[in-house]
Structure formats: C-alpha cells, structure tokens
Design a protein with these regions (language model features):
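Hydrophobic alpha-helical transmembrane bundles of multi-pass membrane proteins
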Residues: 1-414
Length: 414
C-alpha cells in the first residue's frame, strides 16, 4: 500500500506541475494580447527564455538555497557544494532514501523539484508583463538569472523551506506572498528604474490609453491561467492518495474556481458602475485577482467564502490598476496590481479564513515585499550601469519585434 500511495502522490505532483507549467503559455498569450502588435514576438521570445532560465537556475542553485540543511535565513553558503551534487543528481532516478529528501515528502524528489521549479517561472513571468514594450531582452534575461536563482529561493526559504516566517506561524498555502507578491515586488522595482513606455503619458501627466493588440488572445491566456491554477493550488496539497487528501484537493479545486468567478463578476459589475460599460480587460484581471487572492488559503473557506474573497480581489485590482497608472507606474497588463496588491490582501485574508496570526502574516508580506524590491532594485541598477535596460524612443517607435527580434508577429498589418 505504501508503494501505491507513493506512486499516486508522485504522479499527482508531476501532473499538477505540468498544469502549472502550462501557465507559462497563459502568461505569454495574456501579455501578447495586451501589448501593441509591434511588441508581440518579443513577448513570446521573452517568455520562452525566462521559463528556460528559471528551470536551469533553480537546478543549479535555487533549489538548495530554498531547501538547505539548516539555518534561519536561507542556505546562502551552508552545505552549498554538497547541495550542488544533490541538485544536479536529480536526474539519477535513485530512490528518495539514496538521494536524501530535503524535508520528508511522500513522493519523489524529482517530482518535488519539478513542481517547485514551475512556481519559480511563474514569479518571473509576472515581471515580464509589467515591463512589456520598453525593456531590452538581454538585461531582462540577466535579471531573470538573479531573480530565479537567488532572490526568489532566498525569500521562498523563509516560508516553505522552514525559515523564520515558517517558524513564527506565517501561513501561505500556495504562494500569494511567496510567489505572487515576490514577482510583483520585483516587477515594481524594475518598472521604477525602467520608466513608462513612450507616449504613455502626456506632457501634463495625463494618461494616454495604449490598447492591446488582440483581446481574444489575452482572454485565451486568462483561460489557460485559470486551468493551470488548479495545479498551482491543488498540487500544493502535496498528496491525493488518501481519503482526507482527496477531499482536501476537491475543496481546493472548488474554491479556486469560485474565487476566480467572484473576481470576474466583481470587476464586470464595478466597471459597469464606474464607466457605464463592462471592461473586458478588467474582467480578465478580475479573474487573475480572484485566483491570487485565494491562493494563500484555498482549503479552509467554504465555496461561498471563496467567492467573496475573489470578489474583493476583483474590486482591489480595479482600483489599484487605475491608481498606479495615475501615479506614473506603467504596467501594460496590470501585473503589479493583480499579483502584488491583491497578493497582500490574499495573505492577510488568511487571518480570517484560516485563523492565522495577524502579526505573522503582516511580517511576512512586509519581509517578502521589502527584500524582493530592494534586492531587485539593486540588481537592476547594476545591470543598467553596465548596459541600458530601456529601449530607446526610436526602438519603441518601430517596436521591439523589429529592434530586438527581427521578426514581426503581424507583418501583414502596417
């Protein structure tokens, strides 16, 4: 029976990871649909590259930084060389007792690594959307190396690796803070250095609309993300081969779906009330906001409570997008609002839905946001001192497809 349970839980972890991996396609389609047509090929290239970089960097160093043998603030040096051997040995196919599990899971270490690495790529995908339309590719990929290999794993250890947040009772089931707030804080740091797209703001500071190139493509991206989120949240139960875990996974799936639905409806109703029209881009961000909001605790609430959590997320993302835009934060896809601002709400909502400690949750969001923002800001400033991270006005005029890639996504449309 133990072998059957091990096999089923391992299979479940791998399949959940595959669903989360498919979210990379969702982010790609969402971003490609919400940017201008002259930047679409660059978006596709960027997402292919960042996913691959995340996988390699997490294998080389991120995994052992996030799950070291001990310490309270991350395995910066402790056990580094032995951990490299363990990490690079993931492909050996040896059983767990011969490889050595980092924290005693009941499925293979290879499955654990795969499930973890797609979360890393998700965090970096959040940055991709926020900097769309004006960041050069090489600096972006250099930043991806540092975020996925070092910044994300260090703060990830604080919670999931047994670090100080875990020890003080911080609760974040699937990563509203650890993944989404981390990605959004990094995105905010990069955007702060990068500045807005050319023509986004008038000389008087007025906001100029820059509509996306393909709304159906963006909507497809949201549907893919919605589907992938069942693996993101459901897989975080880490087991399915017992009656209790099967019921828990079912509840997580239910709540994930209901929260996204609540976010969509809230954003649609609010946009109708505020503008007289239903804004489809706000509805898409409402879905993502609902998903992010419930990610910190998709298990404890009832289905009705999950709808409420998602709806609040939909309201928050609506006003946050407008507020940040007016403050000069140019975020073409609303990633900082949907993943960052709503991520904070999701973590703090666990105080009500899951009975978590208010102070532990507050310290968690502050620690993750500050560390990630400051570290990312420093890294971006260093990269910018070596090479310009921002495309010139002329390059933005012709589009990054031409200036960075050399292949236009829509050559027939001029």
């Amino acid at each position: 029976m133990e072998e059957i349970k091990f096999a089923l839980d391992t299979f479940y972890a791998v399949m959940a990871g595959a669903l989360v991996m498919w979210m990379a396609a969702g982010f790609t389609m969402l971003e490609a649909g919400l940017v201008q047509k002259k930047d679409v090929s660059e978006i596709v290239t960027k997402n292919l590259g960042l996913y691959s970089i995340a996988c390699i960097m997490y294998l080389v160093c991120g995994f052992m930084l996030m799950y070291p043998s001990g310490g309270a603030f991350g395995g910066l040096l402790e056990g580094y060389l032995p951990a490299i051997g363990t990490s690079l040995g993931l492909s050996t196919g040896l059983p767990n007792e011969e490889i050595g599990m980092p924290y005693g899971m009941d499925y293979s270490q290879q499955a654990d690594f795969f499930f973890q690495v797609v979360f890393v790529a998700t965090a970096m995908s959040i940055v991709s959307g926020a900097v769309a339309g004006r960041m050069k590719l090489v600096p972006f990929f250099l930043f991806a190396i540092i975020l996925t290999g070092f910044i994300y794993p260090i703060q990830g250890y604080w919670n999931w690796g047994g670090g100080f947040l875990n020890q003080m009772g911080y609760s974040d089931y699937a990563g509203s803070g650890t993944v989404h707030l981390c990605g959004a804080a990094a995105a905010l740091a990069v955007v702060t250095v990068l500045g807005p797209r050319k023509c986004k703001y008038g000389y008087d500071g007025s906001v100029n609309p820059m509509p996306g190139s393909n709304i159906p493509m963006a909507a497809l991206g949201v549907w893919i993300l919605w589907l992938g989120w069942f693996g993101f949240n459901g897989g975080s139960e880490l087991a399915v081969a017992s009656e209790g875990s099967a019921i828990a996974v079912s509840q997580v799936f239910l709540n994930t779906n209901m929260a996204a639905s609540g976010g969509v409806v809230a954003a649609l109703v609010l946009s109708l009330f505020m503008t007289g029209k239903m804004d489809v881009t706000m509805a898409m961000n409402g879905a993502i906001a609902g998903l992010v909001a419930i990610t910190a605790d998709p298990l404890s609430p009832s289905g009705g409570t999950a709808v409420l959590v998602g709806a609040i997320g939909g309201v928050i993302v609506y006003f946050s997008i407008l507020f940040l835009e007016k403050k000069g934060i140019d975020d073409p896809v609303g990633a900082i609002s949907a993943h960052g601002v709503v991520g904070i709400f999701g973590v703090m909502a666990v105080v009500v839905t899951g009975g978590a400690s208010f102070m532990a949750q507050l310290i968690g969001v502050v620690s993750i946001a500050l560390f990630t923002f400051i570290a990312s800001f420093i890294v971006v400033m260093v990269i910018n001192s070596i090479m310009p991270i921002r495309a010139t006005d002329e390059e933005q005029d012709i589009g990054l497809d031409v200036s960075e890639i050399g292949i236009e996504a829509y050559p027939e449309f001029k």
